[in-house]
Amino acid sequence: MTAALARLKRKFWLAPVSNGNISLMVDLARRNNFLWDAILGAEIAHDYKRKPDVYLASCAAFDLEPEQCMMVAAHSNDLEAAARLGLRTAHTARPDEYGPNTGERAPTVAVDFAAKNLAALADTLGV
């Protein structure tokens, strides 16, 4: 995953939009060598994902319009909420997220891109 993130970072700003707190996300990033440009989400927006303010505050943090941003997630409901606000969307499969065959293998909503993992998404996006 870190190699795919490094590829994506060559062309795009990267920031998780998390319902977790910032200190948790920093610990996760340090432990796994995730080189985020920022950490966004619930603490910044003072609300939780799938509320519009979470996605809009994340776009605003980079001084971008929603149409200039892409939400990448393994959860179709997060992608659906982001798409309603004009963000582009990419689904990455995590079929074993909570154990064997417990996660999404494919999106259940319309998305701009669907990939089996972040490396495949980087390939699709040309980085």
Where are these regions (language model features)?
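Catalytic-core regions built around general acid/base machinery
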Residues: 1-11
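Glycine-centered short loops/turns at secondary-structure junctions
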Residues: 11-12, 86
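Asp-based, Mg2+/Mn2+-dependent phosphohydrolase catalytic module
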Residues: 6, 17, 22, 26-127
